[in-house]
Amino acid sequence: MDRKLDEFIGDATPKKVSKEKPVRRKKRLKPTSLDSFLPEEHINYFRDLRIGSKKIRNAKIEEL
């Protein structure tokens, strides 16, 4: 541990500059409408309750 700071910096490898393609980001999912998944009865039921789609997703649907 008698090394000086300059010796540590000198041993470091320089960053490589790559000319490869940039990393592609994951595509985001398009927002979907719950109308295409739920029956009309359930859609009307939740609209009457005036609750958001997150609560609709987590709700347990019981017999009307």
UniProtKB/Swiss-Prot annotation:
This is PCNA-inhibitor. A motif (PIP motif) lies at residues 31-38. Binds to the DNA polymerase sliding clamp (PCNA) and dissociates the PCNA trimeric ring, leading to the inhibition of PCNA-dependent activities. In vitro, inhibits the PCNA-dependent activities of DNA polymerase PolB and of flap endonuclease 1 (FEN-1). It comes from Thermococcus kodakarensis (strain ATCC BAA-918 / JCM 12380 / KOD1). InterPro entries: PCNA-interact_regulator. Interacts with PCNA via a non-canonical PIP (PCNA-interacting peptide) motif. Can bind both Pcn1 and Pcn2.
